[in-house]
Amino acid sequence: PAGRTDAGVHAWGQMIGADLPERVNLPVLMKQLNSLCGPSIAVREAVWTKPDFHARYTALWRSYRYTVLNTETPNPFMVDSAWHIIKPLKLRSMQLASDAVIGEHDFSAFCRKPKPADENDTFEHSMRRHVMNAEWRDLGEGVLRFDIRANAFCHQMVRALVGTFIEIGLSKRPPSDMRGLIVSGDRAQAAPVAPPQGLILWEVGYPADCD
């Protein structure tokens, strides 16, 4: 797969690579897979690619979306797709904070470090990522959406960022804290991760000559 997702996280644009004989009829394969996996999993497209294509390592960027429902009353139809927050959020403050994450940074303050493979594993994993876009939007009727695009994401990075943005939106910390958190590299200083159900792996970008 192009990206790994935690339990409860959704994926609209997940990409999967597989080695198949040339005789395979892709439209027929799609129908067969959808009959086996649906309705919670759906294959929306199947195409042939170059032999050296890799769903994860050929990708140039990934984008995620996180949805927040900021209303006094919960919406039963959004229980599994949004984080419901009752107290009013200051969207302007959240957007100011999101501007700070754009660019190349060490996101250790927002990443869960990989566990060592064994007691002899001393490899230091890099948490440097290049964020190309990060933006909050008000979609109306209390629905807020956060979109972020980067070359890659480390474990729980988006959920930790969203959790921190929400604390800023609730005036628990100022927008200027975001830059300081990035510089600190200290996971304990950032907010707990946001719930998984609001997050979607939305799209994965590849070079134009992949197929």
Question: Language-model features: where?
Answer:
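Structured-RNA-binding interfaces characteristic of tRNA pseudouridine synthases
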Residues: 1-211
